[in-house]
């Protein structure tokens, strides 16, 4: 409208009583504070915890912050963000760094008030501080524990006075971003990798490399109906994407395999953001659109690799829809083709990438020969009643990988969300290279695509990386991880944890004749996750957990 313009401003309310929020569980009020963080001048919001157990569980993270602050006194206040999520060393003793917060007292660090004192506005007995004059505002550390007010008014150009009443919106109290308990990288021999180690130089000199597999939960599936136990703000994509990125970058994996990555999120967020951290990106979208018909909501598999560690050689895209059409044309009678296609066409895909290592390793038989690695990243159909479709998709992928393996001596990595629990036919095919003809899953085969059962086999010597935990002797340092494994299957007790389901659906398989597992990312325990009912939560932004394995290429035997 001519002669008028909008004017926006933001304010923070100053209360007499300060409210501290737990840095790990932001829905909880803090009752304890880490004095070590206060003395180290780490941002005070990161020092609060809701219970002694909460603090104890996060103690390794605090130790790292204290050590880094002590060795780099000139570091800025974002130090803890830089090492968020990295692997931490073991330690004990937390009581000396803990103090209780009295609910009636003012929270300070001993010398300086927690919040600023410049008054800019007083309304109705409340004191407000102006924090911005733009259409958008990102809360800062100073805002934690406070209510914010956003005000928008229409101003007359000539008089510079408001026209009518300003529109005002009040927020809930600002809470700090949660700090998930750091996960350690544990050697399968039981020796943890120290956090102060320079992981980059370690990997380059030793010839090992790390692979991460993670279903990040597509925004299209992250609905309030499915995950009503997760606060809406923690379920929003604007929040989850930053939390996921921080977690993924913190693992510093050489190869990253993500599932349920939406097309628009890949192009507009993950690819450019991970590029800043030295990753090259490849993506394969599923072959159909989800819910709205908007092509941007279609999810797929994304594979990233560090440019300083690997070079891209070749990419293969597996569309199970096309394979289903070929199978139907070749084997299914004409009268059943429509029914067969309806059952088999489920839009799942796999992305296969061949990479060349840039680091020295002992896997090559002469210094001038390059080391190749083949990485498959897939997301198998989710419907539990389609057992035949799941098995057929996994079998189709493995037969394709067999052809690649036959063309060159190349280590294989098969990562992803297989939507198949340990002991299922797809898992048996992956882990045992065959399926027992009497397996109960084979009873579901209305199209007879799994017969004879003897054809359900492959020649790849695949082993589940996390089964290394179960195979190791009960040495000190591994007991906790062994308790998080299922001894009957040699797989984790769970990689997917929701209110209605808990179990393992994600795996990293490797070719045992050419690779050996050096270390594994520790597993999470169900008790800690159930504090927030299940996943996703403010702490962990997917309903799956990330898996990571460190590998070394075995020396090749000359033929």
Regions found by a protein language model. Give the residues of each.
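Amphipathic alpha-helical interaction motifs in eukaryotic regulatory proteins
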Residues: 23, 35-38, 50-51, 55, ...
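Structured beta-strand-rich core segments of catalytic domains in phosphoester-bond hydrolases
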Residues: 180-208, 255-381, 386, 456-459, ...
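Eukaryotic serine/proline-rich intrinsically disordered regulatory segments
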Residues: 65-119, 179-184, 291, 319-340, ...
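Metal-dependent phosphoester-hydrolase catalytic domains
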Residues: 309, 345, 359-365, 385-388, ...
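Ser/Thr/Pro/Gly-rich low-complexity disordered regions
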Residues: 1-48, 52-207
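Acidic/histidine-rich helix-loop elements
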Residues: 217-238, 326-330, 343, 384
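Hydrophobic beta-strand positions in extracellular immunoglobulin-like domains
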Residues: 152-154, 355, 551
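Active-site beta-strand/loop signature of hydrolases that rely on acidic residues for catalysis
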Residues: 211-217, 240-270, 352-353, 374-378, ...
């Amino acid at each position: 409208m001519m002669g008028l313009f909008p004017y926006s401003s933001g304010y923070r309310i100053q209360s007499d009583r300060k409210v501290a929020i737990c840095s790990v569980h932001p829905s909880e009020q803090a009752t304890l504070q880490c004095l070590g963080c206060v003395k180290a001048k780490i941002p005070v919001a990161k020092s609060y915890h809701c219970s002694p157990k909460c603090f104890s569980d996060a103690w390794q993270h605090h130790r790292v912050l204290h050590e880094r602050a002590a060795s780099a006194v000139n570091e800025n206040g974002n130090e803890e963000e830089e090492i968020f999520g990295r692997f931490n060393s073991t330690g004990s003793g937390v009581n000396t760094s803990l103090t209780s917060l009295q609910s009636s007292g003012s929270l300070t660090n001993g010398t300086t008030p927690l919040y600023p004192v410049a008054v800019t506005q007083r309304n109705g007995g409340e004191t407000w501080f102006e924090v911005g004059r733009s259409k958008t505002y990102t809360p800062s550390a100073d805002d934690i524990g406070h209510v914010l007010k956003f005000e928008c008014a229409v101003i007359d150009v000539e008089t510079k006075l408001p026209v009518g009443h300003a529109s005002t919106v009040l927020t809930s109290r600002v809470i700090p971003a949660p700090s998930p308990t750091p996960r350690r990288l544990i050697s399968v021999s039981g020796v943890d990798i120290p956090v102060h180690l320079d992981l980059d130089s370690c990997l380059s000199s030793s010839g090992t490399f790390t692979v991460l597999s993670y279903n990040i939960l597509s925004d299209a599936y992250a609905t309030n109906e499915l995950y009503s136990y997760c606060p809406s703000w923690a379920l929003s994509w604007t929040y989850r994407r930053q939390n996921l990125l921080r977690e993924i970058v913190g693992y510093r994996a050489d190869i990253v395999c993500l599932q349920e990555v939406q097309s628009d999120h890949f192009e507009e967020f993950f690819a450019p953001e991970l590029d800043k951290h030295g990753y090259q990106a490849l993506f394969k979208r599923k072959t159909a659109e989800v819910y709205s018909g908007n092509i941007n909501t279609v999810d797929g598999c994304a594979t990233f690799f560090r440019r300083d560690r690997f070079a891209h050689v070749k990419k293969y895209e597996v569309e199970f829809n096309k394979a289903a059409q070929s199978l139907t044309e070749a084997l299914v009678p004409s009268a059943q083709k429509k029914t067969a296609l309806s059952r088999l066409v489920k839009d799942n895909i796999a992305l296969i990438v061949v990479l060349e290592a840039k680091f020295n390793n002992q896997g090559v038989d002469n210094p001038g020969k390059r080391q190749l690695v083949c990485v498959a990243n897939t997301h198998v159909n989710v419907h539990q009643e389609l057992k035949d479709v799941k098995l057929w998709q996994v079998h189709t992928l493995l037969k394709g990988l067999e052809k690649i393996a036959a063309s060159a001596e190349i280590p294989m990595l098969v990562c992803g969300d297989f939507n198949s629990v340990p002991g299922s036919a797809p898992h048996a095919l992956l882990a045992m290279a065959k399926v027992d003809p009497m397996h109960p899953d084979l009873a579901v085969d209305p199209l007879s695509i799994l017969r004879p059962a003897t054809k359900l086999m492959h020649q790849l010597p695949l082993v589940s990386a996390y089964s290394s935990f179960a195979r190791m002797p009960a040495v000190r340092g591994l007991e906790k991880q062994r308790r998080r494994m299922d001894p009957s299957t040699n797989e984790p007790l769970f990689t997917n944890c929701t209110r209605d389901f808990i179990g393992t659906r994600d795996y990293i398989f490797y070719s045992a004749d050419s690779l050996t597992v050096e270390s594994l990312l520790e597993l999470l325990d169900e008790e800690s996750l159930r504090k927030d009912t299940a996943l996703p939560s403010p702490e962990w932004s997917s309903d799956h957990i990330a898996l990571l394995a460190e590998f070394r290429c075995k020396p090749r035997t000359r033929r």
